[in-house]
């Protein structure tokens, strides 16, 4: 073993449904052995193993969890929309804001004008908040370019971020985020551009792991999203969707039936849609930050998701318009207080279920032999405190592929 971590209270989050009353899967007085960036040993402390080993890290009775995974972000963009926040609080309708040049297209304009270097440095700054909350993997979407050139630009920035030694990145193409001004009143033509030009180029250059869509009345229709999914699957890219956020169009059921790793938002999802997620083992990603920021009232169907055993992930949805909040622990708290998840469900939502939402469940999201050695060390007594307490610097360090990065 290259490195050994001792004297820790280990929250493995192993997906073992045979012990439903111990969902945290805690091992007291535990030890982790790491070889070549992967976990080789997990269990109770064995002094005969680590005695005399040259690289032993005494964790001082720290609480250790899998590294957190923020599985839905729009981290790369330029500009901000604080002025729209003020307008909304004064009662100005979003439609009026959009007519004034605001809304998502204001972010599109700013992002198109920014260089790759500018976008990179802005995104790296935003990552700091996620790092402080124990995040070791982040998903990053495009979607503020809406041209071939600018979508590629955003995804190249995500690839640069992935070279950081202390953060792993999963990249998602979200060209079907909004209708660009160049295609006003021509949504089918824009979908053709995505399917025939953007997706093939992204796949050829290996710039994305998934393709996402915004399936809504103010976004794209179910039929248009199906075209995008077909093109993505043809080019061997995973799929996921922004679905049932504002209405129930059936986008979640479509995405699940086509093999989506996750559907996200899902406030208006009905029981038939939930059953489809369960049938196809698709994760429901909850985004309480957007729910809170937009002062929504339609709650996601948590009881139905539990009833049908659909895994629930939690993410920040970090973006300039509806969730400018770079704190995954705040999302855990909101998921508990607003959506009535338990702290155990919240922790599962940012570890093993978040890994599944990105198709990474075989390598991340739990601490077990063979998994990547990504975990977080906390100065806490109980895993419930991760959802309970906010704003206190509880993180001691993050470990990425066995390398330690102190907070």
Curated annotation (Swiss-Prot):
Give the residues the record marks as binding 4-imidazolone-5-propanoate.
81, 144, 177, 245, 322
What GO CC terms are in its UniProt record?
A: cytoplasm
Annotated Fe(3+) binding sites: 72, 74, 242, 317
Can you say where in the cell this protein is located?
A: Cytoplasm
Question: Where is N-formimidoyl-L-glutamate annotated to bind?
Answer: 144, 319, 321
What does the entry give for GO biological process? L-histidine catabolic process to glutamate and formamide; L-histidine catabolic process to glutamate and formate
Q: Which Pfam families match?
A: Amidohydro_1
Query: What residues bind Zn(2+), as annotated?
Result: 72, 74, 242, 317
Quote the protein name from its UniProt record. Imidazolonepropionase
